[in-house]
Amino acid sequence: MKILDGKATSAKVKAEVKERASALKNAGIEPALAVILVGSDKASQTYVAAKQKACEASGIRSVMHKLPQTTSQNELLALINVLNLDDSIDGILVQLPLPAHIDTTSVLETIWPQKDVDGFHAENVGKLVSGLDGFVPCTPLGIMRILKEYGIDVAGLNAVVIGRSNIVGKPMASLLLNASATVTITHSKTRNLKQICSAADLIVAAIGKPNFVTADMVKEGAIVIDVGINRLDDGRLVGDVDFEAVAPKSSFITPVPGGVGPMTIAMLLSNTIRSAQNRAKNLGIVKE
């Protein structure tokens, strides 16, 4: 069994981002990410602060917009349109969840696809499914980077994705399919889940239930990717996989914390730099 170290891999990605940001600045382009936070949700504030800190450490300018809980949908859309038109902004991120009176889909669809560094816009989703070049959601993109870092080729593998969210499950399945894995997506209505998982060479657990994947669901030598971050009543953080029981059976496994989690912000930075490079290319400043 080998641990897939997300901390080490994310540090490598951030170093690459910093180097690319420096090159862009030398060419007269300052990469910039606009982050919009509506309301005062504590978890969202923590995530936003982590993203800001990561931007600053990597040479990306972070532009923060904190809006009150009472902000109307039209006010939020108006701000997004201003940022769309601002040529100095490369990426726009709206921290989710949004207050109940705001339609999330309308908000995400208002962000221009070329600035949609979260990869949630329908155009980017369509490009991913079609195997075209676009922005990909950060968590599944980070998982693919970890697999690549450890020399794991998914082509021909039987892969099972547990969970069908738009943020992780569906894009993860598309990425694996594009990489020539044979993919099964399972969810709350799936029958014979244990049987399906037991035949998998690769399992990606993204269901949001602590210790959901048990040893009897995993075959010997399987690769196990744990996307879950669940806090137990005793304060411990655990994933969707029963790590202690599953790890001895697996060939590779991601821990929680320190596995997939660190990769999400790293790939957000990577997507932002990619957008900035596109801006520089469009301006004729760089050729690649």
Swiss-Prot record:
Keywords: Amino-acid biosynthesis, Histidine biosynthesis, Hydrolase, Methionine biosynthesis, Multifunctional enzyme, NADP, One-carbon metabolism, Oxidoreductase, Purine biosynthesis. Pathway: One-carbon metabolism; tetrahydrofolate interconversion. The keyword GTP-binding does not apply. GO terms for molecular function: methenyltetrahydrofolate cyclohydrolase activity; methylenetetrahydrofolate dehydrogenase (NADP+) activity. InterPro entries: Aminoacid_DH-like_N_sf (IPR046346), NAD(P)-bd_dom_sf (IPR036291), THF_DH/CycHdrlase (IPR000672), THF_DH/CycHdrlase_cat_dom (IPR020630), THF_DH/CycHdrlase_CS (IPR020867), THF_DH/CycHdrlase_NAD-bd_dom (IPR020631). Homodimer. Belongs to the tetrahydrofolate dehydrogenase/cyclohydrolase family. Its EC number is 1.5.1.5, 3.5.4.9. Pfam families: THF_DHG_CYH, THF_DHG_CYH_C. Catalyzes the oxidation of 5,10-methylenetetrahydrofolate to 5,10-methenyltetrahydrofolate and then the hydrolysis of 5,10-methenyltetrahydrofolate to 10-formyltetrahydrofolate. NADP(+) binds at residues 163-165, 188, 229. GO terms for biological process: L-histidine biosynthetic process; methionine biosynthetic process; purine nucleotide biosynthetic process; tetrahydrofolate interconversion. It catalyses: (6R)-5,10-methylene-5,6,7,8-tetrahydrofolate + NADP(+) = (6R)-5,10-methenyltetrahydrofolate + NADPH; (6R)-5,10-methenyltetrahydrofolate + H2O = (6R)-10-formyltetrahydrofolate + H(+). PROSITE patterns: THF_DHG_CYH_1, THF_DHG_CYH_2. One of its GO terms (cellular component) is cytosol. This is Bifunctional protein FolD.
